[in-house]
């Protein structure tokens, strides 16, 4: 099945826009900009939504404005309203367990401690596609909150942006339903030495 809904997880507000936790937002914002998709507030879905053509495919975009730990209040109603099957859903989110500059496409699995996913999976299950954008781990769990809610260092940001570019390059495959080729291309991305 082709992807019909791309969700970017993050926190609303200018103070959070450039924090690591908003890597999912960055992905959706880039898509909207690149493909001239207008994003507008949508009260019904507690988020910012858009719809347009991406590589010849009709795709909806969503950025929840509920704060990360309430992402399900935005994602679940949209999935249900439009009848989006889980294999037509891609959720982009930051991932502590992957170093900055790495990116992984995964289907299935638990929430892995990610509060946005934790709020979504009880309602729709966990068999949807996730674009896991590496932001690295600060080393100790007591530092996680400060890490995800702060800006990446300039070299880290360049690495994250490079990984996101690799995902953009694989979008034609993913949107066309060739998930395995897209996964191979995305998961095989390595930063230049």
Swiss-Prot record:
It holds the Pfam family Pept_tRNA_hydro. Gene3D superfamilies: Peptidyl-tRNA hydrolase. The record marks 11 as: Discriminates between blocked and unblocked aminoacyl-tRNA. It is an enzyme of class 3 (hydrolase). HAMAP family: Pept_tRNA_hydro_bact. Monomer. Belongs to the PTH family. This is Peptidyl-tRNA hydrolase. It comes from Psychrobacter cryohalolentis (strain ATCC BAA-1226 / DSM 17306 / VKM B-2378 / K5). The gene is pth.
């Amino acid at each position: 099945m082709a992807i019909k809904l791309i969700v970017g997880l993050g926190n609303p507000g200018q103070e959070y826009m450039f924090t690591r936790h908003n890597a999912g937002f960055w992905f959706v914002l880039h898509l909207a900009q690149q493909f001239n998709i207008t994003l507008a507030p949508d009260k019904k879905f507690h988020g910012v939504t858009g719809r347009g053509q991406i590589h010849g495919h009709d795709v909806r975009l969503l950025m929840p404005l509920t704060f990360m730990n309430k992402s399900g209040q935005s994602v679940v109603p949209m999935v249900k309203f439009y009848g989006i099957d889980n294999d037509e859903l891609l959720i982009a989110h930051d991932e502590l367990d992957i170093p900055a500059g790495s990116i992984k496409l995964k289907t299935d699995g638990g929430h892995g401690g990610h509060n946005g996913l934790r709020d979504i999976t009880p309602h729709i299950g966990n068999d949807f596609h996730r674009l896991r954008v590496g932001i690295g781990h600060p080393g100790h769990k007591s530092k996680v909150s400060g890490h995800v809610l702060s800006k990446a260092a300039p070299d880290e940001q360049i690495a994250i942006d490079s990984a996101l570019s690799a995902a953009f390059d694989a979008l034609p495959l993913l949107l066309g339903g060739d998930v395995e080729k897209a996964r191979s291309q995305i998961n095989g991305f390595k930063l230049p030495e």
